[in-house]
Amino acid sequence: MKFLFSVLVLFIVAFVCLSNAEPEPDPEADPEAGFLSILKKLPLILKHLPGK
């Protein structure tokens, strides 16, 4: 469980860093699109983690 928590924190930190890296975001882009795509891929990612 501790490993899953650390992976989750790593994903959150990576997402925040990537979303703040762009100084001028595209005004036409949906700001939640990246986050929602990560949430949709999360079960697929968790299924491929070792130790399950």
From Swiss-Prot:
The keyword Signal applies. The keyword Glycoprotein does not apply. One of its GO terms (molecular function) is toxin activity. Coiled coil: none annotated. This is Xylotoxin(1)-Xa1a. Transmembrane segments: none annotated. It comes from Xylocopa aruana (Great carpenter bee). Cytotoxin that provokes cell lysis. Induces leak currents in cell membranes in the same way as melittin, suggesting a membrane disrupting mode of action. Also activates DRG neurons. DRG activation and cell lysis is potentiated by phospholipase A2 (PA2). In vivo, intraplantar injection in mice causes spontaneous pain behaviors and paw swelling, which are also potentiated by PA2 coinjection. Residues 1-21 form the signal peptide. Expressed by the venom gland. Keywords: Amidation, Membrane, Secreted, Signal, Target cell membrane, Target membrane, Toxin. Residues 22-33 form a propeptide. The lineage of its organism: Eukaryota, Metazoa, Ecdysozoa, Arthropoda, Hexapoda. GO terms for cellular component: extracellular region; membrane; other organism cell membrane.
